[in-house]
Amino acid sequence: MTQDELKQAVAQAALDYILPHLEDDMILGIGTGSTARLFIDLLAAHKGKFDGAVSSSEASSEQLKGHGIPVYDLNSVDSLPFYIDGADEANAQLHLIKGGGAALTREKIITAVADKFICIADASKDVDVLGKFPLPVEVIPMARAHVAREIVKLGGNPVHRQDCVTDNGCQILDVYDLAIHDAPALEAKLNNIAGVVTNGLFALRPADVLLLGTTNGVETRFAAKP
């Protein structure tokens, strides 16, 4: 199977996972990226079975609205039973690197609200050690140089993502040359640097379910109980 076919398979698997649980008044959390886009297209056929969605990016919001799915402000929503989104890397603990699409802050906020985070990814995203994919860090523009210097002290090689302004009006540093063996600790350490909005490690609050597209079919993994 091609990578696109694997993405399509996991998008379908995510739809199959949530369909039995949909209710008329339910609002879903929807992520950003190529796999999330496929999921939104599949979800559109079932838009009458739930109330609407909260989205992690303007791009996803426009796609949802284009399908006639209402999009809500998270501040008006009391609960999100499910959040469905992709990842740039995932390890065995369901710790993730996200943010290749520069939507990491909104993704992390929605993840914090959601009861269950369902991550959908193809097998190329499955890694033993996080960090081959550059770790995005969203920063307040005036703090970019300061944050970059602090990241160098941690062993990373930060590169300013040119011509990228996030939906929050911030900038992205992509951090190379990291082998991340303690993702929760690094996530907390980076977030404590003045000027960092957040970083793309999802380890303090990892995925609950990983639907991984492989050549042998979709593999379902669950986060270990604390």
Swiss-Prot record:
The active site is at 107 (proton acceptor). Pfam families: Rib_5-P_isom_A (PF06026). Substrate binds at residues 32-35, 85-88, 98-101, 125. Keywords: Isomerase. GO terms for cellular component: cytosol. GO terms for molecular function: ribose-5-phosphate isomerase activity. InterPro entries: NagB/RpiA_transferase-like, Ribose5P_isomerase_typA_subgr, Ribose5P_isomerase_type_A. One of its GO terms (biological process) is D-ribose metabolic process. Pathway: Carbohydrate degradation; pentose phosphate pathway; D-ribose 5-phosphate from D-ribulose 5-phosphate (non-oxidative stage): step 1/1. It catalyses: aldehydo-D-ribose 5-phosphate = D-ribulose 5-phosphate. The keyword Cell wall biogenesis/degradation does not apply. Its EC number is 5.3.1.6. SUPFAM superfamilies: D-ribose-5-phosphate isomerase (RpiA), lid domain, NagB/RpiA/CoA transferase-like. PANTHER family: RIBOSE-5-PHOSPHATE ISOMERASE. Belongs to the ribose 5-phosphate isomerase family. Catalyzes the reversible conversion of ribose-5-phosphate to ribulose 5-phosphate. Homodimer. This is Ribose-5-phosphate isomerase A. The gene is rpiA.
